[in-house]
Design a protein with these regions (language model features):
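Catalytic domains that recognize anionic headgroups
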Residues: 1-194
Length: 194
């Protein structure tokens, strides 16, 4: 991926970047500064965009909330690791950014949800928690809901966190191997159906 394609020119803040480089060889370690700077610029643009969304929500003076969750992390030649992008089963790819924003009116209307959100802020979660948390955040209830997976709920339960690393590996029972911090299950990973 050419990260410079993910932001407009006015967000090309950190340089040198991949901006203007046609078909860069992403595996060329000589382009590490350009790759990392372009990635950081794309995050700068994402932050700006999210701040615009939050500003719009704030201006409505309504009960409002927003959740942001990335789909995966990235390995970006971190330290002495010579890998980039994702699909390498590294710790960098399994840790993802996420946050919740809520209006003052939301906090006033649902103080117990905010208390539980704060209490659960250090819980070990997976993206499997997102669907259930989004519905709970929106106060949407249904007969088969699973509040034990919502980080807005007092019923939140710790569950095994499986990641796709040579089968379904128990992330919390894994060791981190090598400079790239590759996730290796200490036990036997669950078989994946193809």
């Amino acid at each position: 991926w050419n990260y410079s394609h993910r932001y407009p020119k006015e967000f090309d803040h950190w340089k040198p970047s991949l901006f203007g480089i046609e078909n860069p060889a992403y595996t060329d370690l000589k382009l590490k500064p350009e790759l990392n700077n372009s990635y950081d610029n794309s995050i700068l643009y994402t932050d700006w965009f999210l701040s615009q969304v939050i500003g719009t929500l704030k201006s409505t003076n309504q009960i409002s909330s927003m959740m942001f969750v990335s789909d995966h992390g990235q390995t970006l030649y971190d330290g002495t690791c010579n890998l980039a992008f994702h699909g390498h089963n590294t710790e960098y790819e399994f840790h993802i950014p996420a946050f919740v924003w809520y209006s003052d009116i939301y906090k006033f209307t649902y103080p117990e949800k905010i208390q539980r959100l704060v209490r659960n802020r250090r819980a070990k979660l997976t993206t499997e928690n997102i669907f259930h948390s989004l519905l709970d955040m929106a106060n949407i209830h249904y007969p088969t809901e699973r509040l034990e997976r919502s980080f807005f709920s007092q019923k939140l339960k710790k569950e095994k966190r499986y990641v796709d690393s040579y089968g379904w590996s128990d992330y919390d029972n894994a060791s981190l191997k090598g400079d790239c911090r590759e996730v290796i299950d200490k036990g036997t990973p669950l078989h994946q159906e193809k």
